[in-house]
UniProtKB/Swiss-Prot annotation:
Pathway, per record: Amino-acid degradation; L-arginine degradation via ADI pathway; carbamoyl phosphate from L-arginine: step 1/2
Species the sequence originates in: Streptococcus pneumoniae (strain Hungary19A-6)
Pfam name, any one: ADI
Disulfide bridge map: none
Protein name listed in UniProt: Arginine deiminase
Enzyme active site: 399 (amidino-cysteine intermediate)
Gene that specifies this protein: arcA
Length: 409
């Protein structure tokens, strides 16, 4: 076995180890009035979402893949009382609690939870004001009075089951991301503790991006096309400045990649990440949403004389990919088969967001029937999972998974 606990040098190598997060009580803290604040469009039914997620995890195990869980890894990282206390204080500091008495009450509540995983899951779920002792009227400050109708002392983290985004494994390294929205940036705290203190991963993995950066990048915009070539998305959630910082670190730390293809496409919620419109499913096959093709700009980025060299690519995308992957021809498989209605509907339901677990073997939502049929016509083996509730969060199988180990291809 390699001495590196993280080994991810492709999108398609046989998946051996993956991290998920089983949806928890955080989904039951979603309210209609605050969906936009928490980056949701709808409210999943937790019981069914958990059943769907458990079936997803079991489908991976049935393929011989070891499934890890974020909540367990984070709990295992609290290896001493001092680290546990530090975690609670950082969590409180990042929760934007404006009232001192509320902060004291939450600290007491969290310290009263003795089991580490229960503690971690509570921080994920959020804290309602009704869980805390009532503040006497005479002790309330202006913040308490003005925000009296808001039900949460600390917001939930309902997007956590999309484990692809808070950090990304790249080769033997990790990009610990600074995320687009404050409501999600708190999620990266768990990755910080895993890669700093976990018995297996702590202190053993190079960071090529740090959550303390002030520019934004998310894992859905970080794809590994081969051991030499990365793809990154300039999207609603990831800006060009972050990509430049990431790439300089990757090249300087000699992580192993020689070139990056940067994809610039429409900046909107429909296409929030590159992997919602473009994924690799085999050595020479990709899914793509046809709506991005007209406005797509691709830049080749290399590192020469200690600086980035950036060239805009003007040619055909399939030819560009074939050239960079060293294959004769690349097939772009269009979501919805090019039918404008099917493409829009199935992209919204993550028809382009596939998780490849081996060359030509992909996990997909069963609901995207048009796209799935086309994938099968291209000779791919599909592992179809239900996602009626999971999809309400606007993410598919790739969004819900973070590979920790793949075989080389």
């Amino acid at each position: 076995m390699s001495s590196h606990p993280i080994q991810v040098f492709s999108e398609i190598g046989k998946l051996k180890k993956v991290m998920l997060h089983r949806p928890g009580k955080e989904l039951e803290n979603l309210l209609p009035d605050y969906l936009e604040r928490l980056l949701f469009d709808d409210i999943p039914f937790l019981e069914d979402a958990q059943k769907e997620h458990d079936a997803f995890a079991q489908a991976l195990r049935d393929e011989g893949i070891e499934v890890l869980y974020l909540e367990q890894l984070a709990a295992e990282s609290l290896t001493s009382p001092e680290i546990r206390d530090q975690f609670i204080e950082e969590y409180l500091d990042e929760a934007n609690i404006r009232d001192r008495q509320t902060k004291v009450a939450i600290r007491e509540l969290l310290h009263g939870i003795k089991d580490n995983q229960e503690l971690v899951e509570k921080t994920m779920a959020g804290i309602q004001k009704v869980e805390l002792p009532e503040i006497p009227d005479e002790a309330k400050d202006l913040t308490d009075l003005v925000e009296s109708d808001y039900p949460f002392a600390i917001d939930p983290m309902p997007n956590l089951y999309f484990t692809r985004d808070p950090f990304a494994t790249i080769g033997n390294a990790v990009s610990l991301n600074h995320m687009f929205a404050d409501t999600r940036n708190r999620e990266t705290l768990y990755g910080k503790y895993i890669f700093k203190y976990h018995p297996i991963y702590g202190g053993k993995v190079d960071l090529v991006y740090n959550r303390e950066e002030d520019t934004r990048i998310e894992g859905g915009d970080e794809l590994i096309l081969s051991k030499d070539v990365l793809a990154v998305g300039i999207s609603q959630r990831t800006d060009a400045a972050s990509i430049e910082k990431l790439l300089v670190n990757i090249f300087k730390k000699n992580v192993g990649f020689k070139k990056v293809l940067a994809f610039e496409f429409a900046n909107n919620r429909k296409f929030m990440h590159l992997d919602t419109v473009f994924t690799m499913v085999d050595y020479d096959k990709f899914t793509i949403h046809p709506e991005i093709e007209g406005d797509l700009h691709v830049y080749s980025v290399t590192y020469e004389n200690e600086k980035l060299k950036i060239v805009e690519e003007k040619g055909d995308l399939a030819e560009l990919l074939a050239q960079n992957l060293g294959v004769e021809k690349v097939h772009l498989i269009r979501c919805g088969g090019g039918n404008i209605v099917a493409a829009a509907r199935e992209q919204w339901n993550d028809g382009s967001n596939t998780l490849t677990i081996a060359p030509g073997v992909v996990v997909v939502y069963d609901r995207n029937t048009v796209t799935n049929k086309i994938l099968e016509e291209y000779g791919l083996r599909l592992i179809k999972i239900r996602g009626s509730e999971l999809v309400r969060g606007r993410g598919g199988p790739r969004c819900m998974s973070m590979p920790f180990e793949r075989e080389e291809v």
